[in-house]
Structures are given as C-alpha cells and as structure tokens.
Swiss-Prot record:
Source species taxonomy: Eukaryota, Metazoa, Chordata, Tunicata, Ascidiacea
EC code: 3.4.21.99
Family per similarity comment: Belongs to the peptidase S1 family.
Disulfide bonds: 116-251, 163-179, 265-330, 295-310, 320-349
Region annotation (Disordered) ranges: 29-98
Protein name: Spermosin
Activity regulation comment: Inhibited by peptidyl-argininals with Pro in the P2 position, diisopropyl fluorophosphate, phenylmethanesulfonyl fluoride, leupeptin, antipain, soybean trypsin inhibitor, aprotinin, ovomucoid, valyl-prolyl-arginyl-chloromethane, glycyl-valyl-arginyl-chloromethane, p-aminobenzamidine, benzamidine, zinc chloride and mercuric chloride.
GO-annotated molecular function: serine-type endopeptidase activity
Residues in Peptidase S1 domain copies: 130-372
Function: Trypsin-like protease with a narrow substrate specificity. Preferentially hydrolyzes substrates with Pro in the P2 position and Val in the P3 position. Plays a role in fertilization.
InterPro entries tied to this protein: Peptidase_S1_PA, Peptidase_S1_PA_chymotrypsin, Peptidase_S1A, Trypsin_dom, TRYPSIN_HIS, TRYPSIN_SER
C-alpha cells in the first residue's frame, strides 16, 4: 500500500475546476510543493470520472468518463482568474514567500476543549432540496464552509467557491479528494470561507488559508477508475478556528456505526440548483440512507460501506455541481454528526438513482491519526495505512 501523501501549499495561482478546463499554472515560486501522489491521467477514450451517468433503471450501467479537459459532473464549479489581493482578514499577517506556512509537527495535538454538532440556530427541517433551491436558515449549519479561491474586484471580496468542506476541529476541515483531481500537487492557494451564507454579499465571511492537504492513502481519485472510493482529503488550516455564532465544529460519528436504512440525514452546499433558483445561498437537502446491498445494485458490486455510503432516493432531491466535498449530516442525541462527504452521483442532478458519499465512520482509524486527542478519537487506534 502506498504511503500517505501530504501536500503542503504555498503560492497563489489560477483556480482549476472539475466542470471546466484546467488553466495553466502561474505559481510565482520556483520550488514546487512536495507531493508523491501521481496526478490523474485519464485514458484516451471518452471516459469520465465523477458522478457517472446512470442510464435508465439498469442496475449496473456502464459509466461515461470525461477526458481531463471535460471533467466530472460531481461537483466543483468553474475556473477563475488568479487572486489579485488578499482577503481582508489575511491582510494583517505577512506571507512566507520562501515556502509554505505550516505547523512544524504533522501529528500535532488538537485543542479538544470544544463542543461539537450544536448549531446556534436550529435548521428548518421541513424543507430541503438543493436542486429545488431550498435555502437554509442562516447560521443553522455553522460547520459547513465553502472551499475555493478569492478575488477582490472594485474593493469587494468575491469568493470563487469550488467545493464544500466541513470544519471538524479548530485546525482541520474535511473535504473530497476529487476536489483536487485537476490540481493534485496543489499549485494554487486555497481557502475555506467560514460563515458564508449569501455569495452575493459575503457579509461576515472569514477566509482561512489551507496550508496542508492529506489524501486518504487508499483513494483511487488519481487513477482511471471512475468509481471513487475513499474520497477524503484532510485540510489543515492556517488559523485556529474559534467557534462563535457563525462557525463551529461538526461531531465525528462513532467508529463503524452508520445509521440504518431509511434514516433521514441532511446535505448542505452552495451548488447549482438546475435553474430552479437560490444558486447564491446555502441550501439544504434531505437524504434518506439506503443499504449497502442497494448501493451495490445501483452502482457497482464492489462498493462497500468501508468506503462509500449511498442515499437520496426521492426524485428531484439531490446535491449538484459545486457541492462536492460537502457534508452529509445525521442527527443523534441532539447533535449533528458528519457521516458522509459528497462524492458522486447521477450526471443529471436529481434524476436518480441516488448519490454516493465517502463513509466517515469507517475511516476514523486513519482520520484520528492526525487529531488523536479528540473525544471521538480517544479509543481509536491509529492506522495510517487506511486499512479498515
């Protein structure tokens, strides 16, 4: 099994996207960040990657796989120009132009003295269609953070949201590895944007620079296989996240415990809504979980809950482009737990049969290696190989 790959970030260049073409790097630094992960190399035939197309009711359809210049449908957005200025909250600190700004110790101790999974405002669970455009109550999902680059135009901060992410500790967020499929060596400068609700105003938004990315060692994102497994990336944040009314931490689930089939969980994001409105605000969708057996029947016989869980059987209720890496939250004992990471699904959002999510509960042995003193990790033995 390949060693765990950690990619440290420096510099600022143009944004890539998984639904558009990849622009050439403009990294001003001569020393490229270290990485051992091979970049994605698609075959020469038409093939795609994320959210493979599912024609009709056939249980095991042949996926269509796009070329690298015509990337996957699940779920980042379009490329943007290089940033021209720092976000307001970053201006007070100088950047290290000689290399990445990183904590010295990779296996560092996380301040575990915090509460998780309790929002300052209760979400309205009576509505829920991302594709249908149901807006979330502001501050009701404070663990969700947009992820991408930024620009400043006319003195106004403009976020180029590419994926979603979830804050899980004061120094970490979790997203999908395939969000970096077109930029595996991390040639750009990325941020998570905490407290974001409306992308047209960015009122109260706090950018937090991503200074490290760690892929799951068993992910196949950077291979030719269109059926993603272990679609995880841990994001290390430059600034400590201090919880407040606008941002907070999601709870990690109990190890190897997934809610039963039929449980209603929730996914949130800023993804597109198929021209149904609400593209600029945080939206939410109700997702009913399905069994591993049904997930195998709809997608691939080798799917296992160790890497993937599935859900979302109601027509028209789905995540969509721009929601990749975002959360699947399930509520238990009054708290919200991060059970899944948005990975792939039907190429036409909401058309069925269901979406696939990276399974958090079965990957805590790997995840907890890098935040061992979290309450959720106390009794979990670290396994850096990702074997679960």
């Amino acid at each position: 099994m390949a060693a765990i790959n950690v990619i440290f970030i420096s510099g600022a260049i143009a944004l890539f996207a998984l639904t558009g073409s990849c622009s050439e790097s403009t990294n001003p630094f001569t020393n490229k960040p270290y990485a051992t992960q091979n970049p994605y190399s698609p075959p020469q035939t038409n093939q795609p990657t994320k959210r493979p197309y599912q024609p009709g009711p056939a249980p095991t359809p042949a996926p269509y796989i796009p070329q690298k210049t015509n990337p996957p449908t699940k779920r980042p957005l379009n490329p943007t120009p290089s940033p021209t200025a720092k976000p307001p909250s970053e201006n007070s600190e100088s950047e290290n132009s000689e290399g990445p700004v990183l904590i010295e110790e990779d296996h560092f101790t996380v301040d575990a003295n915090f509460k998780c999974g309790i929002p300052p405002v209760e979400p309205d669970l009576k509505k829920g269609k991302i594709v249908g455009g149901a807006e979330a109550v502001p501050n009701s999902w404070p663990y969700a953070a947009a992820f991408g680059t930024y620009d400043i135009s006319g003195g106004k901060l403009e976020v180029s949201q590419m994926c979603g992410s979830t804050i899980i500790t004061p120094r970490h967020a979790l997203t999908a590895a395939h969000c970096f499929m077109m930029d595996p060596d991390i040639d750009q400068t990325y941020y998570i944007f905490m407290g974001l609700h409306d992308e047209t105003t960015y009122k109260g938004v706090r950018p937090n620079k991503i200074v490290g990315v760690r892929y799951h060692p068993k992910t196949n994102v950077f291979t030719d296989d269109p059926w993603l497994v272990y679609d995880f990336a841990i994001l290390t944040l430059r600034k400590k996240v201090i919880a407040n009314f606008a941002w907070n931490y999601a709870c990690l689930p109990q190890p190897k415990k997934i809610p039963p089939e039929g449980t209603i969980c929730w996914s949130v994001g800023w993804g597109v809504t198929q021209n149904t409105g609400g593209d600029n605000v945080l939206k939410q969708v109700a997702i009913d979980l399905v069994s591993e057996k049904r997930c195998k029947e709809e997608y691939r016989s080798t799917i296992t809950s160790k890497s993937t869980i599935c859900g979302g059987t109601t027509p028209g209720q789905d995540t969509c482009q721009g929601d990749s890496g975002g959360p699947l939250f399930c509520k238990e004992d009054g708290k919200w737990y991060l059970q899944g990471i948005v990975s792939y699904g039907p190429s036409v959002c909401g058309s069925g049969p269901m979406a696939a999510y990276a399974a958090v509960a079965y990957n805590l042995e790997w995840l907890c290696c890098y935040m061992p003193n979290l309450p959720s990790c106390e009794d979990i033995e670290c396994d850096e190989s990702g074997e679960n």
